[in-house]
Regions:
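Cys/His-rich microdomains that often coordinate metals
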Residues: 13-17, 29, 34-37, 239, ...
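Anionic N-terminal interaction surfaces
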Residues: 28, 35-104
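Short recognition patches in nucleic-acid-associated and regulatory proteins
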Residues: 3-23
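Short cysteine-rich clusters marking metal-coordination/redox-active sites
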Residues: 9-12, 30-33, 232-235, 247-250
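Residues immediately within or flanking Cys/His clusters that coordinate Zn2+
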Residues: 4-9, 27, 229, 244
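Phosphoinositide-binding peripheral membrane targeting modules
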Residues: 86-135
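Acidic, Ser/Thr- and proline-rich intrinsically disordered linker/docking segments
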Residues: 114-226
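Short linker/helix segments within small regulatory modules
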Residues: 19-28, 240-246
Length: 256
């Protein structure tokens, strides 16, 4: 088969335009079908046609979960972590039109871990000497930039990590020069207000997500635990508490 022979998508059957082919392990995928895959999915080249078809079915079912998602808490700016604490669900998205973006809706109980990753990059600052050459300072001086990422580890058939940046722009810091030639000063980014702001935000997101994850798991464990019959203090009946912890006969609260 030649380089410019006609190719067709093995998922939807449509003809694939020039430069529109996305290779699969055993076939071809058009860019429109590829666009529907989860944004957290990175194993397309190692996936079979059937595996991609199953994921697209999952993604279509996900639209229904997005429709009924009720946001109870929003964490972050730009890319946001959205919680539906009543249903024990969450999503991560930067989209303004959530229905159109169709972000993956996951159970909080499927979170296996959450960390804050602070990424540092440095660039040496140079100056011109008397001959017009760019040379290092003595001691060398650097400009630093920082980005703050939340990494959420999850149980999901199509991806196991969601990594997103919580600062819209890199935090850039240029430490002041040393007042003593040849002596390098210790630099602490924690003294920078913007750095502290995003580090605190990242820690807050991490702590809240772990807390609501633990709460969701506790609810699941309680619901699965065998119920013990008790005597209702309101109607006197021997009853097994319902899902709300109430008497199955009179509706009186038995727990709380």
């Amino acid at each position: 088969m030649g380089l410019f022979d006609k190719k067709y998508c093995d998922v939807c059957g449509e003809r694939i335009g020039l430069l529109g082919n996305r290779k699969l392990e055993d076939g071809n995928l058009c860019k429109d079908c590829a666009r529907k895959l989860s944004p957290w999915f990175s194993e397309r080249r190692n996936s079979s046609v059937n595996e991609i078809k199953r994921q697209l079915e999952y993604r279509e079912e996900n639209r229904g979960r997005v429709e009924v998602f009720h946001i109870t808490r929003t964490l972050g700016s730009g890319t946001k972590l959205l919680l539906d604490e009543d249903a024990g669900l969450f999503m991560v998205t930067s989209a303004k039109n959530i229905a159109e973006a169709n972000p993956d809706v996951l159970a909080l109980s499927d979170v296996t871990g959450c960390t804050l990753d602070v990424e540092e990059n440095s660039k040496e600052l140079l100056h011109e000497d008397k001959d017009g050459n760019e040379v290092s300072y003595n001691p060398p001086r650097y400009e630093y930039s920082y980005d703050f990422y939340i990494i959420v580890n999850v149980n999901n058939p199509y991806f196991n990590e969601m990594r997103f940046r919580i600062n819209p722009n890199s935090v850039e810091i240029s430490p002041p020069p040393s007042i003593r030639p040849g002596v390098t000063l210790r630099f602490n980014p924690e003294t920078n207000a913007e750095y502290k702001k995003y580090k605190q935000l990242g820690e807050e997101i991490r702590q809240i997500l772990v807390k609501v994850r633990d709460d969701a798991r506790e609810k699941i464990e309680q619901a699965a635990a065998p119920k013990t019959a008790v005597s209702c203090p309101y109607c006197g009946a021997t009853t097994t508490p319902d899902a709300s912890g109430c008497c199955e006969y009179c509706g009186g609260a038995l727990m709380g």
